[in-house]
Regions:
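Residues in the helix-turn-helix
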Residues: 44
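Short, hydrophobic-biased segments on the C-terminal half of alpha helices
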Residues: 49-50
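Beta-hairpin "wing" of winged helix-turn-helix
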Residues: 22, 54-63, 69
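Extended, compositionally biased flexible segments
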Residues: 53, 60, 84-87, 91-95
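Extreme N-terminal segment that seeds HTH/winged-HTH DNA-binding domains in transcriptional regulators
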Residues: 1-40
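Short, cationic-aromatic polyanion-contact patches
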Residues: 4-6, 30, 67-81
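C-terminal all-alpha effector/ligand-binding and dimerization domain
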Residues: 98-243
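A generic "binding-loop/recognition-motif" signal
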Residues: 64, 86, 163
């Protein structure tokens, strides 16, 4: 089954749900109708619907159909089970995004950096500090470490636009999975400066540290994302397994 067909059906249905083409609690068109609409096999359609179920967008009901259960988040929300860029998350939630590069440099990983990034000592990387704005408000300060050998030609201009778009559509990299750790850490002076936080109101940050791998099993990125605590939200959809 071609992945591109399944992906295109999944993305189209997801966009229609997000844009209220199918209203909340409304049943989606029947399976046969969707098969005719997308000119696909039953298995291909069911795989796309299964992913929407995993995302928490729809719920299948035996003998009745597929019901839309999607409700948009009040604030921008990243999805725990998916890898998406800041721009993709903003677009999905209906917000305007902007990224500013504060620092773009190159160096080799030292022993201290190797402990928290996962890169080996001596590995050449691009180090980037980026400030992400949502609707003109600074929300996330990113510390990005990208493996130079895996992302040749990376520039500050690309970093201000979309690094993942460059990786996938120019370098044709397949991004497969990301290991994430979420912690609460003390706010630093850099956090306070760039995220416009008042130390009297906030003394902690929500921090997401991630190691991301491509289809060759190579870790090409370590990123520490430092989020404004008043706008931090990660979304997950949990399913109870039957005994």
């Amino acid at each position: 089954m071609p992945k591109s067909i399944y992906e295109s059906i999944y993305k189209d249905l997801k966009q229609k749900i997000e844009r209220d083409v199918f209203a909340y609690q409304e049943l989606l068109p029947s399976e046969n109708t969707l098969i005719q609409t997308y000119h696909c096999s039953r298995n291909t359609l069911r795989r796309a619907v299964s992913r929407l179920v995993s995302d928490g967008y729809v719920q299948t009901m035996q003998g009745k159909g597929v019901r839309n259960i999607y409700q948009p988040a009040a604030q921008t929300a990243f999805t725990i089970g998916e890898i998406e860029s800041f721009r993709e998350s903003a677009l999905r939630n209906g917000h305007q995004s902007l990224t500013k590069v504060l620092l773009f440099t190159e160096f080799a990983i030292n022993e201290k950096q190797a402990l928290y990034t996962g890169f080996s000592v001596g590995t050449d990387i691009y180090y980037i500090q980026r400030l992400h704005y949502l609707d003109d408000m600074p929300l996330i300060l990113n510390h990005n470490y990208f493996l130079k050998a895996a992302v040749p030609g990376l520039t500050p201009e690309i970093a201000e636009n979309s690094i993942y778009d460059y990786l996938e559509n120019t370098l044709h990299m397949t991004i497969v999975n990301s290991k994430r750790i979420m912690t609460v850490e003390k706010m630093t002076q850099i956090d306070e400066k760039y995220l416009k936080l008042n130390a009297e109101d906030y003394n902690c940050m929500a921090v997401v540290s991630s190691q991301t791998y491509n289809s060759d099993g190579v870790m090409f990125e370590y990123t520490q994302s430092r989020h404004r605590p008043d706008y931090f939200r990660f979304y997950d959809n949990a399913v109870r397994k039957s005994n």
